[in-house]
Amino acid sequence: MAFEEAIKRVFMKKICMKCNSRNSWKATKCRKCGYTNLRPKAKEARA
């Protein structure tokens, strides 16, 4: 894929389930609220 670096930069994030902030891929807790339930950023578009 031609834009693999760009895709990694955009999608290699984790989203806090409590406050929806973006966190680094290696994060174990949210940088804003400290919540530990993080999900990977969705790679597929919603319907």
Curated annotation (Swiss-Prot):
It comes from Methanococcus maripaludis (strain DSM 14266 / JCM 13030 / NBRC 101832 / S2 / LL). Keywords: Ribonucleoprotein, Ribosomal protein. InterPro entries: Ribosomal_eL40_arc (IPR023657), Ribosomal_eL40_dom (IPR001975), Ribosomal_eL40_sf (IPR038587), Ribosomal_zn-bd (IPR011332). One of its GO terms (biological process) is translation. It comes from the Archaea. SUPFAM superfamilies: Zn-binding ribosomal proteins. SMART domains: Ribosomal_L40e. NCBIfam families: PRK04136.1. This is Large ribosomal subunit protein eL40.
